[in-house]
């Protein structure tokens, strides 16, 4: 049986950043890069150090008597740091003028989730509004709505379909189909966790309180830049799409405290900078990076 409680546990189990409190540190290995500015070859060199610190806080502040409607508030903070070396550039000033660059990203969101039935099957609706920015100011308001229909739920298999609609003029794909498939193999400790378009993982319990995963995940990153040197002046946004392949180990220190360790190879699909609010197809700067090793450490707290 699917209830709001079981649905919520499924989400927090798969995505640590949706738990009450989560903190993660990610270190990316050194890599070579080359870039274009305003369509022209611009700069090449080496990223010696690239790391991220992320903190997430989520708190349900209203639950209806029927337990079918929940309002949740969320706060996000990210610190991202780059260190460059061996740079070869032309005379134009680009988005990363210094050898070391630091960025701060903040976001706050309100999310409404409602569970009902469609064709006698559970369906979960969600609407989320987000305000984000950097240390300079609030920069944008955006949001999305989604619907997820549970097609099948048994002891070994869960299948859902749905759609996500972005309320964001800069979105390249305003409507995204959603599909999830989780299946525990018969007479096996392994299960498959597939979420379109985000991940494909093969998982198994390990030791008494651990879980091991092997697979690939698609992640996106963004932050804002306040640029003051021509040809780029004003507020811009960096968007990066990454494909991470490797292994994950999760450990339950207690029923409420969970640890995370990930290691593998990070492939940057693209890194683009646009004017704030513009679609990423209208980028003014892009750069390519070679594949790099990475690791991530995290710890989260979830009392529910």
Segments predicted by a language model, with ranges:
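Repeated loop/turn-to-beta-strand initiation elements of outer-membrane beta-barrel proteins
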Residues: 64-69, 117-124, 156-161, 188-191, ...
């Amino acid at each position: 049986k699917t209830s709001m409680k079981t649905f919520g546990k499924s989400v927090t189990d798969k995505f640590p950043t949706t738990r009450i409190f989560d903190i993660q540190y990610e270190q990316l290995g050194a890599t070579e890069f080359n870039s274009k500015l305003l369509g022209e070859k611009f700069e090449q060199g080496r990223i010696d150090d690239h790391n991220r610190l992320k903190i997430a806080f989520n708190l349900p502040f209203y639950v209806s008597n029927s337990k079918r409607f929940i309002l949740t508030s969320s706060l996000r903070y990210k610190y991202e740091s780059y260190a460059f070396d061996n740079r070869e550039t032309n005379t134009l000033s680009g988005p990363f003028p210094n050898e070391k660059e630091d960025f701060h990203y903040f976001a706050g969101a309100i999310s409404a989730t409602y569970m009902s039935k469609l064709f006698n099957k559970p369906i979960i609706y969600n609407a989320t509004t987000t305000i984000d920015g950097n240390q300079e100011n609030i920069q944008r308001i955006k949001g999305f709505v989604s619907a997820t229909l549970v097609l099948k739920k048994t002891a070994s298999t869960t299948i859902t379909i749905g759609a996500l609609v972005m309320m964001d003029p800069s979105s390249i794909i305003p409507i995204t189909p959603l599909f999830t498939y989780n299946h525990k193999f018969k007479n096996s400790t392994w299960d498959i966790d597939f979420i379109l378009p985000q991940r494909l993982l093969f998982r198994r319990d390990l030791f008494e309180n651990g879980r091991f995963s092997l697979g690939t995940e698609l992640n996106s990153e963004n932050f804002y830049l306040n640029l003051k040197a021509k040809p780029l002046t004003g507020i811009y946004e960096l968007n990066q799409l990454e494909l991470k392949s490797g292994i994950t180990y999760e450990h339950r220190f207690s029923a409420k405290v969970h640890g995370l360790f990930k290691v593998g190879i990070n492939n940057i699909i693209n890194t683009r900078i646009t004017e704030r609010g513009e679609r990423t197809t209208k980028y003014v700067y892009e750069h390519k990076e070679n594949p790099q090793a990475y690791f991530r450490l995290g710890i989260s707290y979830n009392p529910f």
